[in-house]
Each structure stands twice: as C-alpha cells, then as structure tokens.
Amino acid sequence: MSLENKAGTCNLAGKFCTVAFLEKWRYRLGESSLRRQMKKNHRQVKAFNLRQAKEVGILFDATTLEKYEPVRSFIAFLQEQGIHTHVLGYINDKKIPDSYLLRRSFHFFSKNDLSWIFKPVSQHAINFYEKNFDILFCLDTENLFPLRYIATLSRAHFKVGRFFPDHQHFDFMINLKEDTSVAYLIEQIKVYLSNLRTSNESEINKPIPAEK
C-alpha cells in the first residue's frame, strides 16, 4: 500500500472515530436530559390486568414488518377484549414508509422527529407519554433510546415491558433469555397479565422469567 493510500485510510478511520464519539456523546446528553425529566415526572402507580384495563398505550419498534405484524395481532386481541388502544411506532430510519401512513389509529415517528440528543419531539410522541393509560405496553426488545425515553416519561398507571438490567423503568418486567422476539414477548405478556392478581404487590416491580 502506498503512503498516499495509507494516509487516506487513516483519515477515513479518524473521521469514523470522530463521528462515533460524537454520537455517543449525544446519547449521553440525551440520557442526562431524561434523568432530569424523570425527577419531574409524577404518576399514580396502580396495577391492572387484562380484565380490568379499559385504555392502553402500545409503544413499539416499527422499523421492520417482522416486528410490526405481531404487534398488529396483539392490538386486534386487545380490541376483542373491549380495550381501547393507542399505538405509537418508531421507525429507526429517516423516512416513514408510505404504507404505514395509511394505517388508521396508528401514529409513527422517525429519526427526523428526534432532537440533536435523540429526544422524541413529535407531537404524537409528546401526546402519547402525557396520557394516563391504564397500561403501557412497551414492546421494544432492543432498548432503543427514543422508545425508552417515551416509556420512562409515560404517565401510564402500569408500565409493562422487557427487563433490561441497566434500565428498570417498568412496573412489571419480563426477563427474556433465549427467545427475544417481539412475538414471544407479547405471548408472555398475554399469559402473565391475564392471570395477574393486582392485589398481590409482591408481583410488581420485579423481572418475571419467561415461561418455557
């Protein structure tokens, strides 16, 4: 390799490192902002099961159809139980697919709806986390910051989602191990929240192992 080619490679590597460092720094600023907002976030925690819930919020990663389809089936299941649903999906890209824009009663936001520190700033996102749902179902299995931001600030009475060791911001957490798919998370949510005894406080705010 010539000296000129080596210099070009080094320059590219340097630029990549700079971009990666800057993005990491921006995420840290976002985390710091979220921690400050958490201190101002007051809500009434109250457990609900699927027999009691009347209105729920569903928050999910809508980037791929693989994750979208199980969520759509879950929404249909909830509506069959007479539960009113509010749905917000995040597209981990700059453009929302045109087909998504035709979905009635669904709202979406994308990377273009994030601030410089990755904070969701779309009106749909703000309206969502300010609503007092009976239950918030966060169906994100990858701990994406924009979704975690909304879930953390949500005023829902009862927050349900996957257990993450470093971010325990749900009231009811399911510890996925081998199968970390959205479909499996939903399956476990249906099992546990159909049988949850809301008077038993020992079941709240601890990770629940997924059923075999």
Locate each region found by the language model.
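N-terminal amphipathic/basic-hydrophobic helices that include classical n-h-c signal peptides
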Residues: 1-18, 212
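Residues at the starts of beta-strands that form the adenosine-phosphate
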Residues: 55, 83-86, 158
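Conserved nucleotide-cofactor-binding alpha/beta core module
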Residues: 79-129
